[in-house]
Amino acid sequence: MSNGYEDHMDDVCRDDIGRTNLIVNYLPQNMTQDELRSLFSSIGEVESAKLIRDKVAGFEMRSSSLSKGHSLGYGFVNYLNAKDAERAINTLNGLRLQSKTIKVSFARPSSESIKDANLYISGLPRTMTQKDVEDMFLPFGHIINSRVLVDQATGLSRGVAFIRFDKRSEAEEAIASFNGHKPPGSSEPITVKFAANPNQNKNVALLSQICHSPARRFGGPVHHQAQRFRFSPMGVDHMSSISSVNVASSATSGWCIFVYNLGQDADEGILWQMFGPFGAVTNVKVIRDFNTNKCKGFGFVTMTNYEEAAMAIASLNGYRLGDKTLQVSFKTSKSHK
């Protein structure tokens, strides 16, 4: 999954600024840029702090700190003193913030060697944790970011992970060594390959394989009651203030997902809680009847990352919400508007 690392380094990390610039991963979604600066200022004088936000326009939130876009869960902090930067890594790396454990490491200027270093791994044993996966791939190089996809209801692994290496060459070595390899505790070989680029046309075929394969890797639709979801009043309040939703599916505006067969009482909060665990969600919209203000049975969700959107579709298509079985797919021109 792309965390935008190489896309933002030109802005944040021009030329060689020494060992003062840090990248901070796994930040809580609701953490603000001011809070990021405040946290790292406790170690030493911070020259700049930047929380990376989604570039998708077309919506506004009530909080001014979120008005420029939804946080992508990572940022950069640049210290005036290299010793403070090193001390921040030693002190704050592994710090638990809300439900996240942040990762703090040195950032590097953008170059071709660090682009396209993101791996997609499937077929992992369900018992493997994020740490297990990182330990497995760590011998190949420095890991910038990693994520194991889990079932949002049970918290159990889905056997799928993404790992972003520091360099493409490290990712290539991992593919050469582990693609088709059987890890301990597994009777089946795992698949290790470069994560799909949202700009590539072949993603359409990839999505078809993920979502329409007769033998779905996740064992078919998962049936849970709507009450299993936990709601965040703050999250619902933010999402209710969205004035418009861009439903175009593209690499620049995000990937729009069509959700059909929602109940009359469905609201934006349900969509937010359902799709949020799969990745960065920028927009949600429940289509309502003008007279009754009840849901008309469908809505839209926009996610920034293709792999995360595809995984959400593969997992939630056929999901039973209350007494309804959802139909979830990428929005096409023939979808409801």
Curated annotation (Swiss-Prot):
One of its GO terms (biological process) is gastrulation. The lineage of its organism: Eukaryota, Metazoa, Chordata, Craniata, Vertebrata. Interacts (via RRM3) with cirbp. Unable to form oligomers. Part of a ribonucleoprotein (RNP) complex, at least composed of elavl1/elrA and/or elavl2/elrB, igf2bp3/vg1RBP, ddx6/Xp54, ybx2/frgy2, lsm14b/rap55b and, in a subset of RNP complexes, stau1/staufen. InterPro entries: ELAD_HU_SF, Hud_Sxl_RNA, HuR_RRM2, Nucleotide-bd_a/b_plait_sf, RBD_domain_sf, RRM_dom. The keyword Manganese does not apply. It is found in: Cytoplasm; Cytoplasm, Cell cortex. Belongs to the RRM elav family. SUPFAM superfamilies: RNA-binding domain, RBD. It holds the Pfam family RRM_1. RNA-binding protein that binds to the 3'-UTR region of mRNAs and increases their stability. Involved in embryonic stem cells (ESCs) differentiation: preferentially binds mRNAs that are not methylated by N6-methyladenosine (m6A), stabilizing them, promoting ESCs differentiation. Binds to poly-U elements and AU-rich elements (AREs) in the 3'-UTR of target mRNAs. May be involved in cytoplasmic mRNA polyadenylation. Acts cooperatively with cribp to stabilize AU-rich sequence (ARE)-containing mRNAs. May play a role during gastrulation. Required for the vegetal localization of vg1 mRNA. This is ELAV-like protein 1-A. Ubiquitously expressed in adults. Residues 20-109, 117-197, 255-333 form the RRM domain.
